[in-house]
Structures are given as C-alpha cells and as structure tokens.
Amino acid sequence: MAENAGFISVPWGQHKLGAMYNTPFPSISRPKCIGVCSINASREFVDDASCASYLAGQPWPPLPFDLNGGIEDVIRKPVENGKRDLEIMLTYIKQHQKELLRQSSSDARNLRLDSDFVTLRGILRQIMCLQYDNRSFRVKATLLNGNVYMCKEETPEQQLENANMSRAQRVMCSWGFKFEQYLTSAQAQGKPVTNVPVNEAEEFMGVYRTNLAGILMLYGAELDCVDSKEPVDFKDCRVLDSLKFVELKTSVFNMNPHQIRTFKSFKSANWWSQSFLVGITTLYVGLRDTKGMLQRIDEIDVATLARNKPWSASAMAWYLEQFLRNLKKLLVNINDPFAVVQVTFLNKHASYEVLRGPEHQILPNWYRDLLKTRS
C-alpha cells in the first residue's frame, strides 16, 4: 500500500546543461493525429474544425508590421483551472466513444481507453523541460479503469506571478496572437484579416496518440495552423494523419547576449518539445522589437533546434518516460479510482500527496458515469 505522501523518483541529475549525454533516445512512435475539435469564443467545446486556420498564402503583409494593432480591443482568454483543459479532452472522448472506448479486460462492466495516459500536450512539454528549469510545476492525476488522467494545477508561485503580471507583459503575450492573425486565414490560400480584434479565447485542438517506450498516450494539443493550398476535410482520419501543421512563434529581434543564452538553454527546448510531441517539422518565427514592430520572419526546421544546444532531447524524453512510468506505478499501488495524486515539482524534487474527497476530483461525475463507474 502506498503512503499518502512521499516522493516520485525522477532522474533530476541525469544531465546538466552543457554536459555530454550519451543515452540513446527512447523508442517513440510518430505522433498520430486521430481527430480535431474546436473551443469557441465562449470557451465551449465544438466537435468540428470551425476554429481551424490555414497558413496564409504568400506574399504576407509587407514588413515591418505593427503587433499592437487593435490591442485595446483584444478578447482575452478567461482564467481557467487545469481541470477545464482536461474536461475538453473528456468531452472529445464522449463524442467519439464508439471509436475510443472498449470493455475493460479486468471488469466487463466498465469501459476504458487503449491508453496509459490521457492529458494535454502542454503538460507533457513542461515535464520534459523540468530538469532544466527551477520554477515550480504541479499536476494532479487519477487512475480510472487502467487509464491515468492528468491535468495541471497552478502552484502558489504561479498564482502570484499571474496576479502580478504587468500590462506590458500582457501586451507582449498578445503580440504572439496578433502575429498569428497576420499569417493565417480561415480559408486555404486566403488572405489574413488583421483589422478585427484578436480573439484569444478561441482554439483549434488536435487529438494525438503516441507510444513512448511502451507508455501509450492520448493527448490534446492546440494547433496554430495547417499548411495546405487546398481545403482540408478534417473529418477524414487518413487526411488528418498526412497534414502538415506548423507552429507560429514570436521572439526578440537582435537579441542581446543574455537573451541568446536564455534562448539556447530554455526557450529552444520548449519550442522543440512542443513541436516534437505533435510531429511538427516547421516553425515560422516573427522577430519583433521592443515596441512590437515585426521586423523579420524566419522559417525554422524544428530538427535544427536540438542541434548544438546545452540541453539534450534524449534526456528530456527519458525524464518524461521515467516520471510517467513511476506515477502510474504509484497510482496502481494506491488502487483507488477516487484518489487524486497531486505532484509538485520544486527544488529538484517531485513530491506527492494523495488527496481524497469530492473537492479534489479531476474527473466529472458525467465522465465516470460514461465509463460505468459508481462510487
């Protein structure tokens, strides 16, 4: 029987920035997109591709262009807890239960997924980068019918950081959304529409499967746009798996030495892992000055991000694999479908606490009912 509190073993010391790391990359299948959905302006789940965007046909708007356009009228994404992101995935599973759910081999009265983990790409990315990051991070997980469901939870440090975010910081966050507006269109080969406020609440999400060293994962990932000259039938799974999605990023034009070090040690690792987890091979990076004027657009091959960097892509993948494997082992030992394990990464430790009670649940009752589980 597992303790109600303790530590999860993760390889914090396996690699230090700049050191050699010779362990080969763990086996991993190519991430496969099995479906898509949208989150509309009201933050409601929509089982279609209505929020999808296409990479706009070139030539793009002439440079430089102003990322501050319409900044006062931006429609910002409301503050939500991590359970809400997971619930979007659960709603997708409900809508596609015929394809995704099957009888549990251990109890025919219950249904389960062909996955060890159900989560979000952003959580996997952050876990991969944790060994190089001193900031705190927290997840909650529960085991139901053999599947681990995992969402994020804000730490006190993150809550304080978000509460104290300055207007200038919020504006810089909005620059990234405005850059997306300049480079995307609602139609294939369409032109960008940049004279309307950016709606940061809308999302287009892909649902992916992959196998990391025997750990099967099902996760959602927000996608910026698809690079296609023809309209896409997002309902066709064969088409989905062959699409070329691209990521759009903004960064600093003419970086100073500190910014260059930060990019090489941290930001490039985040960009690489985010793209790697969904099989994206191309980034378009808008380089902007301190006033939000975009000066240049670079096309970057994602594979080059991992070259000649102080971090190790292999170490990041092994860190994720070890954490997921040991987290599931802990949950299996706890053997309680209503127990929630809260894991806090802080000061090079991954401490856990077992939480019980309705106030701690991360799975809504309707989802438990869907899987025929009763308390």
Curated annotation (Swiss-Prot):
Its cofactor is Mg(2+). GO terms for molecular function: 5'-3' RNA exonuclease activity; metal ion binding; mRNA 5'-diphosphatase activity; nucleotide binding; RNA binding; RNA NAD+-cap (NAD+-forming) hydrolase activity. Mg(2+) 1 binds at residues 180, 224, 247-248. Keywords: Hydrolase, Magnesium, Metal-binding, Nuclease, Nucleotide-binding, RNA-binding. Its EC number is 3.1.13.-, 3.6.1.-. It catalyses: a 5'-end triphospho-ribonucleoside in mRNA + H2O = a 5'-end phospho-ribonucleoside in mRNA + diphosphate + H(+); a 5'-end NAD(+)-phospho-ribonucleoside in mRNA + H2O = a 5'-end phospho-ribonucleoside in mRNA + NAD(+) + H(+); a 5'-end (N(7)-methyl 5'-triphosphoguanosine)-ribonucleoside-ribonucleotide in mRNA + H2O = a (N(7)-methyl 5'-triphosphoguanosine)-nucleoside + a 5'-end phospho-ribonucleoside in mRNA + H(+). Binds 2 magnesium ions. Mg(2+) 2 binds at residues 180, 222, 224. GO terms for cellular component: cytosol; nucleus. One of its GO terms (biological process) is NAD-cap decapping. Substrate binds at residues 43, 120-122, 222, 249, 274. Belongs to the DXO/Dom3Z family. Interacts with Rat1. Decapping enzyme for NAD-capped RNAs: specifically hydrolyzes the nicotinamide adenine dinucleotide (NAD) cap from a subset of RNAs by removing the entire NAD moiety from the 5'-end of an NAD-capped RNA. The NAD-cap is present at the 5'-end of some RNAs and snoRNAs. In contrast to the canonical 5'-end N7 methylguanosine (m7G) cap, the NAD cap promotes mRNA decay. Also acts as a non-canonical decapping enzyme that removes the entire cap structure of m7G capped or incompletely capped RNAs and mediates their subsequent degradation. This is Decapping and exoribonuclease protein Rai1.
